[in-house]
């Protein structure tokens, strides 16, 4: 039986471009694929015909030989680089189904890489605010030095006969085909006959890796620093993973952080609160002063602009908020106690209301409450 013209099989003109040939082959292969036509001998024959036509026309040398001599180019040892043997169906159908489901085709072991590694870096607030360079040590998998990651003692590897070097095999599920890691070579695509004595064929060994990390100024808890290629070494010489360093800032004895702002409490004496005063407060950049006006109450906030944290993103500076707390005196001397008693004696009648309005309001509220309860 004479063969059909390859261009006719694919439904393209003789001057068709490589892209037109590929699209035509996709249509033909999808239409006649055995998975879509189970038990249909005619469809299976048409599928093989499409495959053979594309294998010839997609190869520049074979196409030129075919254009010059037709099917005779591949008979009786004539030129053209050998007869049609079939394209890599994994690549073709990776393209087809990748386009359908939104993914791209993956070449042999293209998706394999080393695992990413996580590390928690604890910093003091001062270190996080100023930035720091820190050396860390992480246990991870690194490339085996004696075999350079190949896993082979003599550097020789063989292509896996099961997956033909792809690292994946196709599994049929009804009319659908799935890909999974090749069980024969464990997804490597190669087989090692003489395993490396150091890594036992794995191509990787466990090691404590020492790295120097530059932490930028202004980082906060939860920020992550990515170090590309510093994760686990990839299997069989594939690319390494990444290292993700997560920052965790320790609690501070004085300051509490809220984004780029800092908060602290400033205790003051009763006399300072009543009469007013100037007090010195700590900041991350040194000391500063805040002026306490007379009659200041507990909870009043004083804002020191630019005394917070310089943002790691915008480089603007946050503020420092100082909350004053009026401290009740303790361990009083006899003289101090007597003075306070004399002072308290002045709070009588309307003077008490005038000098302690909140206390008077509270007492009035309590009295009104009990009056309503007992009436």
From Swiss-Prot:
Q: What is the scientific name of the source organism?
A: Xanthomonas euvesicatoria pv. vesicatoria (strain 85-10) (Xanthomonas campestris pv. vesicatoria)
> Where does the chain bind Zn(2+) 2?
160, 163, 182, 185
MF terms from GO for this chain are: ATP binding; heat shock protein binding; unfolded protein binding; zinc ion binding
Where on this chain does Zn(2+) 1 bind?
144, 147, 196, 199
- Describe the protein's quaternary organization and the partners it interacts with: Homodimer.
Record key words, sorted: Chaperone, Cytoplasm, DNA replication, Metal-binding, Repeat, Stress response, Zinc, Zinc-finger
Q: Does the keyword Secreted apply?
A: no
HAMAP family registered for this protein in UniProt: DnaJ
Family per record:
Belongs to the DnaJ family.
By what name is this protein known? Chaperone protein DnaJ
Residue ranges spanning the membrane: these are none
Zinc fingers (CR-type), as residue ranges, are 131-208
Do you know which InterPro entries this protein is assigned to?
DnaJ, DnaJ_C, DnaJ_domain, HSP40/DnaJ_pept-bd, HSP_DnaJ_Cys-rich_dom, HSP_DnaJ_Cys-rich_dom_sf, J_dom_sf
User: Could you tell me which CDD domains the record lists for this protein?
Assistant: DnaJ, DnaJ_C, DnaJ_zf
Cofactor names from the entry are: Zn(2+)
The record places domain J at: 5-70
Q: What is the lineage of its organism?
A: Bacteria, Pseudomonadati, Pseudomonadota, Gammaproteobacteria, Lysobacterales
- Domains: entry comment: The J domain is necessary and sufficient to stimulate DnaK ATPase activity. Zinc center 1 plays an important role in the autonomous, DnaK-independent chaperone activity of DnaJ. Zinc center 2 is essential for interaction with DnaK and for DnaJ activity.
UniProt entry tagged with the keyword Chloroplast: no
Q: Where are the CXXCXGXG motif repeats?
A: 144-151, 160-167, 182-189, 196-203
Q: Where in the cell is it found?
A: Cytoplasm
Q: Which GO terms describe its cellular component?
A: cytoplasm
What's the stated role of this polypeptide? Answer: Participates actively in the response to hyperosmotic and heat shock by preventing the aggregation of stress-denatured proteins and by disaggregating proteins, also in an autonomous, DnaK-independent fashion. Unfolded proteins bind initially to DnaJ; upon interaction with the DnaJ-bound protein, DnaK hydrolyzes its bound ATP, resulting in the formation of a stable complex. GrpE releases ADP from DnaK; ATP binding to DnaK triggers the release of the substrate protein, thus completing the reaction cycle.
GO BP annotation list: chaperone cofactor-dependent protein refolding; DNA replication; protein refolding; response to heat
Q: Which Pfam families match?
A: DnaJ, DnaJ_C, DnaJ_CXXCXGXG
Q: What is its main location?
A: cytoplasm
């Amino acid at each position: 039986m004479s063969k059909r013209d390859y261009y006719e099989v694919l439904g393209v003109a003789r001057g068709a471009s490589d892209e037109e040939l590929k699209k035509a082959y996709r249509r033909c292969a999808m239409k006649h694929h055995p998975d879509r036509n189970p038990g249909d001998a005619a469809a299976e024959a048409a599928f093989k015909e499409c495959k053979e036509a594309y294998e010839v026309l997609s190869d520049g040398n074979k196409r030129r030989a075919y254009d010059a001599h037709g099917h005779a180019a591949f008979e009786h040892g004539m030129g053209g680089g050998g007869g049609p043997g079939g394209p890599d169906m994994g690549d073709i159908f990776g393209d087809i189904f990748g386009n359908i489901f939104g993914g791209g085709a993956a070449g042999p072991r293209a998706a394999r890489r080393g695992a990413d590694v996580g590390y928690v870096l604890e910093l003091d607030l001062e270190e996080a605010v100023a930035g720091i360079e820190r050396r860390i040590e992480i246990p991870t998998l690194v490339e085996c030095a004696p075999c350079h990651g190949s896993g082979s003692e003599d550097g020789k590897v063989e292509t896996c006969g099961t997956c033909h070097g792809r690292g994946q095999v196709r599994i049929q599920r009804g009319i659908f085909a799935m890909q999974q890691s090749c069980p024969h070579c464990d997804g490597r695509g190669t087989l090692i006959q003489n395993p490396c004595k150091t890594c036992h064929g794995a191509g990787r060994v466990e090691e404590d890796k020492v790295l120097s990390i530059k932490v930028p100024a202004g980082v906060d808890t939860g920020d992550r620093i990515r170090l590309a290629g510093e994760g686990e070494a990839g299997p069989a010489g594939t690319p390494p993973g990444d290292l993700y360093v997560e920052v965790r800032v320790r609690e501070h004895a004085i300051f509490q952080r809220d984004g780029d702002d800092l908060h602290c409490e400033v205790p003051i004496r009763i006399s300072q609160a009543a009469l007013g005063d100037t007090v010195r407060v700590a900041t991350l950049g040194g000391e500063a002063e805040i002026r306490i006006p007379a009659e200041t109450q507990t909870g009043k906030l004083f804002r020191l602009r630019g005394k917070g944290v310089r943002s790691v993103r915008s480089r603007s500076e946050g503020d420092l908020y100082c909350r004053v707390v009026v401290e009740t005196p303790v361990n009083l001397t006899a003289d101090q106690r007597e003075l306070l008693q004399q002072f308290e004696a002045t709070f009588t009648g309307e003077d008490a209301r005038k000098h302690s309005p909140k206390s008077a309001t509270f007492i009035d509220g309590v009295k009104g409450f009990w009056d309503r309860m007992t009436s």
